[in-house]
């Protein structure tokens, strides 16, 4: 099983080929190819490569499927024994990316 751990949008993801992942919004067009080059770890059929901090010889190719918004999160603030209440909602802007290939140079 071939997988990689990648840093993108300030977070780390366990990536496998043929699957799609939701990242924080990436400002690119739909259908465009992207390359992820901040690879922290690669497992290639049992052979493990660890970057210090990144692996320069590994690139991951992906395709942007869609831009979407995440599930709504409600933030409710209230002060006890007062009439102060504040309800606020937030939906995170996301980009869905299909991972096509993990390339090792």
From Swiss-Prot:
- This protein's encoding gene: rpl21
Tell me where it resides: Plastid, Chloroplast
Keyword annotations from UniProtKB, A to Z: Chloroplast, Plastid, Ribonucleoprotein, Ribosomal protein, RNA-binding, rRNA-binding
Q: How does it assemble?
A: Part of the 50S ribosomal subunit.
The domain of life is Eukaryota
Designated name of the protein? Large ribosomal subunit protein bL21c
Its cellular-component GO annotations read: chloroplast; mitochondrial large ribosomal subunit
SUPFAM superfamilies, per database record: L21p-like
Give the lineage: Eukaryota, Sar, Stramenopiles, Ochrophyta, Bacillariophyta
- GO MF terms held by the record: rRNA binding; structural constituent of ribosome
User: What family is it from?
Assistant: Belongs to the bacterial ribosomal protein bL21 family.
* HAMAP family (UniProt xref): Ribosomal_bL21
